[in-house]
Regions:
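Short, low-complexity, polybasic intrinsically disordered segments
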Residues: 113-137
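Catalytic cores of nucleic-acid endonucleases
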Residues: 2, 62-115
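Acidic active-site catalytic centers that drive phospho-/nucleotidyl reactions
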Residues: 19, 44-46, 59, 108
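Residues at secondary-structure transition points
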Residues: 9, 13, 17, 42, ...
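Acidic-basic catalytic patches of nuclease active cores, encompassing PD-(D/E)XK
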Residues: 1-38
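Active-site metal-binding core of divalent-cation-utilizing nuclease and nuclease-like domains
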Residues: 28-57, 137
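Conserved catalytic cores of phosphodiester-cleaving nucleases, focusing on short active-site segments
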Residues: 26, 47-69, 88
Length: 137
C-alpha cells in the first residue's frame, strides 16, 4: 500500500474509491479530468471534468449499501442541502472567474454505492449520475 493511502481514514478511502469510479465513468463518456479535490474559495470541488462542449463540476456522494437494504440516512444525494448547493455554485463561479472558458459550465451530482464483501474488500456496485442537477435552482 502506498504511503499516501496508508494515512487516510476508511471513510476517505471509500470516498476516493467513489471519486475514482465516477472519473472513470465520465472518461468512458469522453470527458477528461481537469482537477480533483480542488479547494476554491474555502470550498472543495470533488471533480472538474471537460469534453469538447462542457466543463463539469461534480459532487460525488459515496455510501456503503447492501442489496435491497434501505438507506439509514436516505439517498447519498439527499445529503446535499440548500447550503451545500450554494457553496458548490459559488466554488464553480469562482473557478470560472479564475479560469475563463468558452465551454458550457454544468454542476452534476454522482451517487456511488459500495458493497462490503464477506472477505472485507469493497467494490463499486452502482454509479448514478445526475447531470445539471441544480440547473436553475
Amino acid at each position: 500500500m502506498s504511503d499516501l493511502l496508508r494515512n487516510i481514514t476508511p471513510r476517505q478511502r471509500v470516498g476516493r474509491m467513489g471519486e475514482d469510479a465516477v472519473a472513470m465513468r465520465y472518461a468512458e463518456m469522453g470527458f477528461a479530468v481537469v482537477a480533483r479535490n480542488l479547494h476554491v474559495s474555502r470550498n472543495e470541488i470533488d471533480l472538474i471534468l471537460q469534453n469538447e462542449t462542457h466543463l463539469v463540476f461534480v459532487e460525488v456522494k459515496t455510501r456503503h449499501t447492501a442489496p435491497h437494504t434501505p438507506f439509514r440516512f436516505g439517498r447519498p444525494a439527499a445529503a446535499i442541502d440548500k447550503d451545500k448547493r450554494a457553496r458548490m455554485r459559488k466554488a464553480a463561479e469562482d473557478y470560472l472567474r479564475e479560469h475563463p472558458t468558452s465551454l458550457q459550465p454544468r454542476i452534476d451530482v454522482a451517487e456511488v454505492y459500495v458493497n462490503r464483501l464477506p472477505d472485507g474488500t469493497e467494490n463499486v456496485a452502482e454509479i448514478k449520475l445526475f447531470p445539471a442537477a441544480y440547473a436553475g435552482r
